[in-house]
Regions:
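A short, exposed helix-loop element centered on a Lys and neighboring polar residues
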Residues: 114-115
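Conserved glycine-rich cofactor-binding loop
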Residues: 9-10
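Substrate-binding pocket helix/loop in short-chain dehydrogenase/reductase
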Residues: 89-91, 95-100
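Conserved hydrophobic beta-strands of the Rossmann-like cofactor-binding core
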Residues: 2-5, 78-79
Length: 120
C-alpha cells in the first residue's frame, strides 16, 4: 500500500512519513524543500520516495505524479497535510497577496491534488 503525504518536510507530515514507513507502508513524501526530503530518504530507506511538489503549480503537480516510479505510482491513500499560514495580520493590515498564496496552496492545491489522485 502506498501513501502520499504532502507537507512531508517538517512537523506532522514528517512524523507521519516515519510512522507509515515503520508500519510497513510505502510512502511518497511531498514538499517544496527537497533537501529536507532527501534527509528523510536517507533515514527511512527504500520505502520512502521524496517528491518535490509545489501545490500552487498545477502543471508541475500533474507531471510529478506522472513521474512516480513503480511501485510508488499507484497511490492508495492521500494525506493532504501540506499548507501554510500567511496574511495573519488584522484584516485591515493583511496583505492580499499573502491571502491569495495561502488560498492557492491550502484550498486550490489540496483540491487539485485530490482530483488527480482520485481516479486511481
Amino acid at each position: 500500500m502506498t501513501v502520499l503525504i504532502t507537507g512531508a518536510s517538517a512537523g506532522f507530515g514528517e512524523a507521519m512519513c516515519r510512522t507509515f514507513v515503520r508500519a510497513g507502508f510505502r510512502v511518497v513524501g511531498a514538499a517544496r524543500r527537497m533537501d529536507k526530503l532527501q534527509g528523510l530518504r536517507d533515514e527511512l530507506g527504500g520505502s520512502f520516495y521524496p517528491l518535490e511538489l509545489d501545490l500552487t503549480d498545477r502543471p508541475s503537480v500533474a507531471a510529478a505524479l506522472a513521474s512516480l516510479p513503480p511501485p510508488f505510482g499507484e497511490i492508495d491513500c492521500l494525506i493532504n497535510n501540506g499548507g501554510l499560514a500567511l496574511g495573519l495580520d488584522a484584516a485591515d493590515r493583511a496583505d492580499f497577496a499573502d491571502w491569495e498564496t495561502m488560498i492557492e496552496t491550502n484550498v486550490l492545491g489540496l483540491a487539485y491534488l485530490t482530483r488527480l489522485v482520485l481516479p486511481q
